Every structure is written in C-alpha cells, then in structure tokens.
C-alpha cells in the first residue's frame, strides 16, 4: 500500500459502449441536421408549394441517407441462435448465451451475450468486428483475437470467414461486398445528379437519374445475391444448435429504396409526357403554357402583371398617324394632366 501512496488500488471498469454503430450514427445525424435546416426555412414558403417542397425534401433525404447507411451497415446477412456452448479454450465450463452473426459489405460482426449476462463470475457480453475492406487484413485481425483469448463461439465463427477456411465464406462475401458497394456508390452519385437536375428546368433528366439510382441499387442486390450463392451453405454448429443466416435489414431497405426510386423515375417520365405543366407546378417551376399569356413576377417574369400581351387587346395596337395626332390634341384640351396624355 505504501507504493500506492496509502490509497486503494484503482481498477478500470468496463469500457462504455455506444448503442449503435458510430458510422451509421454519423450518417443519420448529418441527414437529420439537413432535414432540420430545411424545416426551419419552411415557413418562408407560401401556398401549397410548401407541402410539395417538404415532400420532395423528405423523400430525397431519405433516399440519400438509406444509400449511405446500407453501404456501411453490417446487417446484410444476419443470424442468431440461443444455445449452451463451451466458453473458452482449455476449460470445461459451459455457458448459456445468445450468439449473433451480422455480415456486412466490409466484414463480419459477432456478438456473444450470456443469458444471464453474469456467469462464471464475469460479465459475458462481447461484440467483435472483423473486416476485409481495402487496406484491412482479416487474417491479422483473427490472429490478434486468438492472442486476446476471445471466447470459443466468437473464434469459431470468425475462423469460418478466414481466407484459408474450407467453407469459402471469405471469398464469397468479400466478392459480394466489393461489387455491391461499388454499385451503391454509383447509385449515390446518380442521386446527387438527380437532385441537381431537379432544381433546374430539366426535370425529365432528373427523373432519368432517379431511375438510374434505383436501377443501380437493384443491381447491387443482384450482385450480392449472386455472389453469396456461388458456394454451398456452410453449417455453423454452436453447441447443439445450428446458426442459420438470412437477408438482413440492409438488404430489404436497399430493395425498398431501389423500387421507390424506379417508381418515382418512371412516374416523372410519364408525367413529363402526359402532364408536363403539372410536373413543373409540383416542382415550383414556371409553367410557360402559352408565350402570349401575361407575365407574372412569381413565374420569373420581369414585367408587372398590369402589362399584358398584345394578344389580349381586341384591337390592333397599331394607331394611324392621323388618329394619333387628333388624340393628342384632344388630350391637351380636355385632360392636360392625364398621365396617358403625357406619353
């Protein structure tokens, strides 16, 4: 105790964990901040265009956030099982636990939670990630996990995804992750271009880019499904149970967002051909139905509404020279202060 300054020794407690993936949390916060910013300026928009504008903003932000979120999500293929299994190597102790497996585009996430959490005089609550993204070495991460002495269920599932595993899950999911991620990045770029074009008087091309956004998302799902079905399923035995995987939330969110983009793109293309003026009105753009109609300041015109087209006049605007001189003389005699006579 003297070496500690006559104080009790301090042992660090368990590290606090964030309730969700920090990358996904950052993406959600960015888009929520953008949505809050648009809502703040919403009262400055008058008329029915306010609701149309809010609908466009919410839909666009949802599509962009969904594309980015699923690209970094670890829930493309998920599975969970409750079983009794061995705990650690060189030990005959068994535990009752919930074991979860989440496979993403860039790696796997393995969870082990005891039921109850307190067993064998310790807290059984593990959440380990092993990645194979560009610049990462999955084999090295697995070797470090062996050195740390992680529980047997975590090491067993992680070993199934190593490059040398006979299951072939590493090549299968790594290939699927690379191609799927590439398609999603292209879809995100198409979404950016769609937003730019929809803010310009080229709405039909914005609809085409929105259609391309949905097509690339559906292609991403196709690549993921094809790559993950190249090899036969590898059984994952944990104690007396078998862990089975299935498509996770990220897969279904991508499918929903892709179909939504395709439907919106097709709807805009049809509306541009059938009802172009209503489409422009929905996007709060000028509706130039007839070039002979009067100009309005709200439609981007430079003239006041009191200036009308020559077509609105029942008579020709060309006045003969003799009539003009007589009219001028009448003005000087009867209404000398009339502003029209001053012209």
Swiss-Prot record:
Coarse class of the protein's main subcellular location: membrane
InterPro entries: Dual_oxidase_maturation_fac (IPR018469)
GO process annotations (BP): hydrogen peroxide metabolic process; positive regulation of hydrogen peroxide biosynthetic process; positive regulation of neuron differentiation; protein localization; protein transport; regulation of inflammatory response; regulation of thyroid hormone generation
Protein name, per record: Dual oxidase maturation factor 1
Source organism: Homo sapiens (Human)
Biased composition (Basic and acidic residues): 330-343
Spans within the Cytoplasmic topological domain: 46-51, 205-206, 271-343
Tissue expression as described in the entry: Specifically expressed in thyroid gland. Also detected in esophagus.
Purpose of the protein: May be required for the maturation and the transport from the endoplasmic reticulum to the plasma membrane of functional DUOX1.
Gene behind the chain: DUOXA1
């Amino acid at each position: 105790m003297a070496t500690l300054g006559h104080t009790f020794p301090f042992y660090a407690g368990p590290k606090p964990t964030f309730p969700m993936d920090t990358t996904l949390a950052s993406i959600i916060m960015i888009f929520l901040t953008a949505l809050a910013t648009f809502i703040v300026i919403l009262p400055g928009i008058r008329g029915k265009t306010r609701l149309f504008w809010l609908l466009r903003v919410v839909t666009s932000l949802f599509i962009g956030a969904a594309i980015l979120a699923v690209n970094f999500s670890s829930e493309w293929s998920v599975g969970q099982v409750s079983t009794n299994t061995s705990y650690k190597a060189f030990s005959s102790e068994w535990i009752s636990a919930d074991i979860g497996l989440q496979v993403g585009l860039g790696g796997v996430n393995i969870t082990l939670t005891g039921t109850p959490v307190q067993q064998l005089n310790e807290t059984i609550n593990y959440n380990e990630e092993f990645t194979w993204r560009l610049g990462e070495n999955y084999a090295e991460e697995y070797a470090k996990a062996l050195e740390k002495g992680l529980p047997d269920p975590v090491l067993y599932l992680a070993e199934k995804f190593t490059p040398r595993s006979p299951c072939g899950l590493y090549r299968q999911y790594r290939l699927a992750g690379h191609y799927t991620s590439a398609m999603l990045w292209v879809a995100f770029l198409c979404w950016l271009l769609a937003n730019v074009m929809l803010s310009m008087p080229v709405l039909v091309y914005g609809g085409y880019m929105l259609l391309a956004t949905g097509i690339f998302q559906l292609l991403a799902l196709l690549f993921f499904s094809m790559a993950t079905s190249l090899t036969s399923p590898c059984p994952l035995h944990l104690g007396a149970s078998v862990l089975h995987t299935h498509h996770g939330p990220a897969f279904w969110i991508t499918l929903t967002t892709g179909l939504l983009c395709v439907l919106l793109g097709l709807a805009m293309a049809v509306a541009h051909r059938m009802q172009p003026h209503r489409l422009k009105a929905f996007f709060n753009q000028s509706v130039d139905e007839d070039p002979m109609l009067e100009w309005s300041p709200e439609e981007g015109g430079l003239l006041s509404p009191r200036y009308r087209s020559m077509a609105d006049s029942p008579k020709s605007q060309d006045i003969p020279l003799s009539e003009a001189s007589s009219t001028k003389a009448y003005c000087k005699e009867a209404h000398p202060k009339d502003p029209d006579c001053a012209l």
